[in-house]
Curated annotation (Swiss-Prot):
Protein name in UniProt: Homeobox protein Hox-A5
UniProt organism field: Ambystoma mexicanum (Axolotl)
DNA-binding region(s), residue ranges: 73-132
Cross-referenced PANTHER family: HOMEOBOX PROTEIN HOX, HOMEOBOX PROTEIN HOX-A5
Cellular component terms per the entry's GO annotation: nucleus
Family the entry assigns: Belongs to the Antp homeobox family.
One Pfam family in the UniProt entry: Homeodomain
Subcellular compartments: Nucleus
Amino acid sequence: VAVGSSSHISSRDGLGTSSGTEDDTPGAAGRREGKFTARSERTLGRAGGGPPQIYPWMRKLHISHDNIGGPRGKRARTAYTRYQTLELEKEFHFNRYLTRRRRIEIAHALCLSERQIKIWFQNRRMKWKKDNKLKSMSMAAAGGAFRP
């Protein structure tokens, strides 16, 4: 290869060639990919009980963009115990809004963070608002149907 010619890349690097040889055919590309896959499986120790093979149908369908959910990724959904839910519902029944002091007390009593308590109450208020809107609409519709 001439010193001034940098258009040729070794096919051993897995990047293919840019000179018009027969290695540019689609079949050759498939053979190169097959060699790379076999080589990478050997390097990962696949035969020694490594991670299971991931087939194309097991991969994610949607491409995620970098740093949308922050560096940690998507937060897992909190699963509240029945006891926690019952206590939160009881508190909501008496007061739909919490003071900071009461939020801290509940968080310590239920072993949850203040943030979880705050968000639970926000979500519960939205549910309450939606339920009341549906009730008022159904009562208005029922009242209109029974007029003499």
